[in-house]
A protein has these predicted regions:
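Glycine-rich cofactor phosphate-binding loops and adjacent beta1-alpha1 units
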Residues: 149, 191, 196-271, 311
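Residues in the short beta-alpha loop(s) of Rossmann-like NAD(P)-binding domains
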Residues: 37, 186, 254, 278
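Mid-domain Rossmann-like dinucleotide-binding core that forms the NAD(H)/NADP(H) cofactor-binding site
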Residues: 128-207, 211
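NAD(P)H dinucleotide-binding glycine-rich loop of Rossmann-like/cofactor-binding domains
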Residues: 54, 81-160, 298
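Glycine-rich beta-strand-centered segment in the early N-terminal region that forms part
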Residues: 9-24, 39-87, 126-128
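C-terminal hydrophobic helical "lid"/dimerization subdomain
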Residues: 187, 236-240, 280-332
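Local beta-strand N-terminus motif with an aromatic residue
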Residues: 154, 221-222, 297, 310
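Rossmann-fold dehydrogenase core element
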Residues: 247, 260-299
Length: 332
């Protein structure tokens, strides 16, 4: 990664908006592009050279012909550009379009001083601060996961992982009225999950955790389990924990393989649901979620780096220090 001058996009073209990025969150999926591991990214596109950054807070500089945003307005960017014609797009699930393009991956992203994006990708956030605005994108992934899992008020849910996505899932589930247990090995992250609405936080070996959750649910197991950690060993545990007729939502991505007993599916009639990215509707709901909980979310933003130290920020994030949660690059 280098700091370099690039061509100015000039005035907004038809259907597009020019924005001035303020803050960009670093995500685990960014590591693949940064390290050259593009095989883990979707689509046979030309990746390099590429300006990264898909968790973006920005100020509108030129709204072009867009009628939805105004000059000077702060916006979050929904980074997904679906094709619009495939089966998922035609059925309202553009988030899994096989030909999608992603800002910051297939197209240049927010780690630059001016960025041109389609008007359909910008969402006004009112007086939300830049860090929280950048967090709308990961929050939208949590919102989508819980939409897939059909979270219900009053029901018990277990969230595996208290990274940014897991914490956002804890927040969103609690905001929906669910009773949440969040599982993570790092005490500081468990503490933050508690502050974001978890009823219980825990970390224990497999059998001890199973016993603890069974006790919490009066022996039934939780109706909903959301896996955000990406650890291959968690899925078999989730299938064991979830109640009969329950739902398991898999958000965390892993290139490994997980061993489990297929008989658990007909025996318990479990719904196992994948969850990827977010729809535009999820993104709008995430704007509302983050806006309503901005004070609680402030502790998520653990480290800040200026744009001139972006490479250092990525290397720091990839070292996975235990005190780091969401690392933000300030752009302008």
């Amino acid at each position: 990664m280098v700091i370099a001058d690039v061509s100015d996009p000039g005035p907004a073209r038809a259907g597009n908006v020019i924005v001035r990025p303020e803050a960009v969150g670093i995500c685990g999926s960014d590591f693949h592009l940064f390290s050259g591991d593009v095989g883990a990214l979707s689509g046979a596109h030309h990746f390099y050279p590429r300006i990264q950054g898909h968790e973006v807070s920005a100020i509108v500089e030129d709204p072009g012909d867009a009628a939805t945003v105004n000059e000077g307005e702060r916006v979050a960017i929904w980074p997904l550009l679906p094709c619009g014609g495939c089966y998922p797009c035609r059925t309202g699930r553009a988030n899994v379009c096989p030909r999608f393009r992603l800002v910051g991956v297939h197209l240049d992203g927010g780690l630059q001083q001016r960025l041109e994006v389609p008007a359909s990708t910008v969402f006004g956030v009112g007086d939300l601060d830049p860090d929280s605005t950048a967090f709308v994108e990961p929050a939208s992934i949590a919102v989508h996961a819980l939409t897939r899992g059909n979270v219900k008020p009053g029901e018990q849910a277990v969230v595996f992982g208290a990274g940014p996505i897991g914490l956002a899932t804890t927040l969103a589930a609690a905001a929906a009225g669910a009773r949440v247990t969040t599982v993570d090995p790092i005490p500081a992250r468990r503490d933050l999950a508690k502050r974001l609405g978890a009823e219980r936080v825990t970390w224990a070996p497999t059998q001890a955790l199973t016993d603890e959750v069974r006790d919490w649910t009066n022996g039934e197991g939780p109706p909903l389990v959301v896996e955000t950690s990406g650890e291959t060993g968690v899925l078999p545990q989730a299938l064991d924990l979830v109640s009969a007729a329950g739902r398991v939502v898999v958000v965390g991505m892993s290139s490994g393989t997980a061993g489990f007993r297929p008989g658990v599916f007909p025996e318990k009639e479990i719904d196992v649901l994948g969850s990827s990215c977010a729809t535009a509707e999820d993104f709008l709901n995430a704007v509302h979620l983050v806006s309503a909980n901005r004070a609680s979310l402030a502790a998520i933003f653990s480290h800040h780096f200026p744009l001139t130290r972006a490479a250092e920020a990525f290397e720091f994030a990839m070292s996975r220090p235990p005190d780091a949660i969401k690392i933000v690059v300030t752009v302008n």
